[in-house]
Amino acid sequence: MIQFLLAAPRSGSGKTTMTCALLMALKRRGCAPCAFKSGPDYIDPMFHRAVLGVESRNLDLFFSAPETVRTLYAKGAAGHGAAVCEGAMGFYDGLGGVSDRASAWHLADTLGLPVLLVVEPKGQSLTLAAELNGLVNFRTPSHIAGILLNNCTARMHVLLAPMLEKEMGLPVLGFLPKPVSYTHLRAHETSAHL
């Protein structure tokens, strides 16, 4: 089964947009994906439902023990060809903003999921590699397995991808372009670049 968690250095990086694009791409490829959201957020799961037409489940390590979260994940993913988890806030941001407990990293660690890091390369190039190196090396294991660029032009992707792969030793798996207007963006236009 295809399974991964999408995370980002901070809120507002495009995790939900990227999650919905990947869910749609997996659905179109016949993978029968299911969706999960870390924490108690009910808004992002509504977007997942709109894309998939199925329920999106919350996995919360504050309200539930790790064993319970593992069971909920296994039951929710059963019968699906792909399971996509969307992290909340910044990758390591957990309880009170000063702990990694109940963070996206904690969820990836609990479930043993690879992490795809969604980053916006706005106003950065090589400095982005330094920032990402910090995220990769902050906890061991970080579970970070790949990078997705958001709000990125094709030209910037061609420039950044080889540099990031060289500096990070991680693949840049794709990008989403900066849309003219999110209100005019259709799901098939978003997922076409992945």
Kindly give the residue locations of the regions a language model identified.
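Beta-strand-loop-alpha "switch" segments that mediate conformational coupling across diverse proteins
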Residues: 169-182
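Conserved small/polar residues in nucleotide/adenosyl-binding loops
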Residues: 183-190
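GTPase G-domain guanine-specificity segment
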Residues: 151-168
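ATP-dependent carboxylate-amine ligase catalytic core
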Residues: 2-17, 23-111, 119-146, 155-159
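Short hydrophobic alpha-helical runs that function as membrane-insertion/retention elements
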Residues: 115-118, 173-175
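Short, structured patches in soluble enzyme cores that scaffold and shape functional sites
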Residues: 148-152, 176-177
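N-terminal low-complexity segments that are often proline-rich with Ser/Thr-Pro
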Residues: 192-194
